[in-house]
A protein has these predicted regions:
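Transmembrane helix-loop junctions in multi-pass membrane proteins
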Residues: 28-31, 61-66, 109-114, 192-202, ...
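Helix-loop-helix module between adjacent transmembrane segments
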Residues: 58-59, 132-157, 164, 168-200, ...
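Flexible loop linkers connecting adjacent transmembrane helices
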Residues: 64-92, 116-126, 130, 138-173, ...
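Extracellular/periplasmic helix-exit of transmembrane alpha-helices
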Residues: 143-155, 267-283, 294-297, 330-333, ...
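Membrane-embedded translocation segments of transport machinery
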Residues: 242-245, 249-252, 257-324, 329, ...
Length: 492
């Protein structure tokens, strides 16, 4: 009896403590701590080692296809992507599919993320970013090839595929739980990583540009942000509710425009600062193995340079997460390996071209970089404005808005596929698009920092079931690749 009394008393004291200290605050701190620990794992060294390891394994097993067949990749992607071709019902053209995938991967990280990697890891981080992209090309090739090979038609007659389908159809029912986990993590990711954080970037870019030119005052920003959120929500709804055809049509117009727009201006920075270019290349290669010369670091700086470069390459092109393969699965093609070539091209365009040009803007412009301190888009903006003048801030705002909007569209498609797979019902897609569009308004007006951080963690967790599937299905990738090139050789 006395034991029961003591237990009851202790429980009462504990409850009183929670009330006094604030149960909500304690729970919030606990969630934050747990989320941070998991986030550090899935976006940290263990995850990077796994992703790089899978990319290396696939590269070895395919004979480093991404290097050996790179001329063929260019021939079958850039060489054919502008040919006019109508897709069959329920599908996109291969070009529309790669543009939709690029819409999801080419985002604000290409501007802000690269700047952060250079600021912390030094110029040598660019070299390690290239290395990770080289292996990521083969990872993305495998993801796309498997997605097209194991895809299926939904009730609406549309092609659906991606990691959850190549797990389901490639590994069998005993691995079904991995497909469910992948889709669940995906649904918990799309509203934060794919939507709200992107809208927040759009709002911040517009606010900064308008304040700089005194178009509006600080007092009007809350109203302006609401208007921007509503406009973005309406545009997102118009695109997504138009179905797979409209998503593909918008992507094939928006992505090439924004990429070319950014590339031309970035190349201009390099050309106008051409005398610095050889020195920048020297800094990249020398800094890869001796970053202390630039960052002022000591023993740990080489590891930091590698970590920042590799992580930026992985996080930018999403090789290992499997998301881009969902868009590629919509392509009107009968040859999985040929669509896989677009996966290689996707990583090349995202990381080798766009991320590298961002690095060149920062390093060639001659701006002062405070190595060892965190930085973001402001470093890239400074590189443009130093070369072109103050008007370049407007250009950067436009680029950020385009990159962010395209990401919202791409992740909207991914989210609909995740939810339909979980619910075994395509009727949830349109209501999802409505809710997803509405989140754009919240992203523009409400600070939900912890929720978006949790979404980022779930985004990282998506890599675990996908990497397991890639390992188990690597033999299928090798066989499909051998059969494809044997057929190509036989047909001349």
């Amino acid at each position: 009896m006395s034991q029961c009394v003591r237990t009851a008393r202790d429980l009462f004291v504990f409850v009183g403590f929670l009330n006094r200290e604030g149960m909500g605050r304690i729970m919030l701190e606990t969630i934050t701590a747990v989320n941070q620990a998991v986030n550090n794992f899935v976006w940290g060294v263990p995850a990077m080692v796994c992703i790089i390891g899978v990319g290396l394994l696939l590269s070895v097993r395919t004979g480093f296809l991404q290097i050996r067949k790179f001329p063929y990749v260019i021939k079958t992607t850039i060489g054919r992507m502008f040919r006019k071709k109508d897709a069959s019902d329920g599908a996109m053209t291969p070009f529309q599919a790669v543009c939709t995938a690029l819409a999801g991967t080419v985002g604000t990280g290409n501007i802000a993320g690269v700047a952060g990697a250079i600021a912390i890891g030094g110029p040598g981080a660019v070299f390690w970013m290239w290395c990770s992209a080289l292996l990521g090309m083969c990872t993305k090739f495998a993801e796309v090839t498997l997605a097209v090979h194991f895809r299926e038609r939904n009730a609406a007659g549309e092609w659906v595929g991606g990691p959850m389908y190549y797990i389901k159809n490639g590994l069998g029912k005993h691995w079904q739980f991995l497909a469910v986990l992948y889709s669940l993590f995906g649904v918990l990711t799309v509203f934060g990583t794919g939507n709200a954080t992107q809208v927040n970037t759009i709002v911040a870019a517009i606010d900064t540009a308008l304040l700089e030119y005194n178009v509006v005052g600080n007092g009007a920003l809350s109203t302006l942000n609401l208007v921007v959120g509503i406009v973005v929500a309406m545009l997102v709804a118009m695109v997504l509710l138009g179905g797979i055809k409209r998503i593909g049509s918008v992507s094939e117009r928006l992505v090439p425009f924004m990429a070319l727009f950014y590339i031309v201006l970035a190349v201009g920075v390099v050309v106008l600062n051409l005398p610095r270019f050889p020195l920048v290349l020297e800094a990249i290669f020398a800094g890869a193995f001796n970053p202390a010369a630039f960052t002022g670091g000591t023993i740990g700086s080489l590891f930091i340079s590698m970590q920042k470069g590799v992580s930026r390459g992985i996080f930018s092109n999403e090789a290992g997460l499997g998301t881009g393969s969902i868009a590629h699965a919509c392509a009107d093609t009968k040859k999985p390996v040929k669509q896989g070539m677009f996966g290689i091209f996707e990583v090349f365009a995202d990381t080798i071209v766009i991320c590298t040009l961002t690095a060149m803007v920062i390093l060639c412009s001659g701006i002062t970089v405070n190595y060892g301190t965190a930085a973001g888009a402001e470093l890239t903006i400074s590189g443009f404005t130093t070369t072109y003048g103050g008007w370049a801030s407007i250009f950067t705002a436009v680029a950020l808005c385009c990159f962010a909007f395209s990401t919202i569209i791409g992740w909207g498609l991914y989210g609909s596929r995740f939810l339909a797979f979980l619910c075994h019902n395509d009727k949830v897609v349109r209501p999802f698009f409505v809710v997803y569009s509405f989140v754009s308004i919240l992203g523009a007006t409400v600070d939900l920092g912890l929720l978006w951080s949790v979404a980022d963690t779930f985004n990282g967790l998506m890599s675990i079931p996908n990497l397991i599937a890639l390992l188990l299905l690597s033999g299928t990738v090798v066989n499909l690749t051998k059969e494809f090139f044997a057929s190509e050789k036989a047909n001349g």
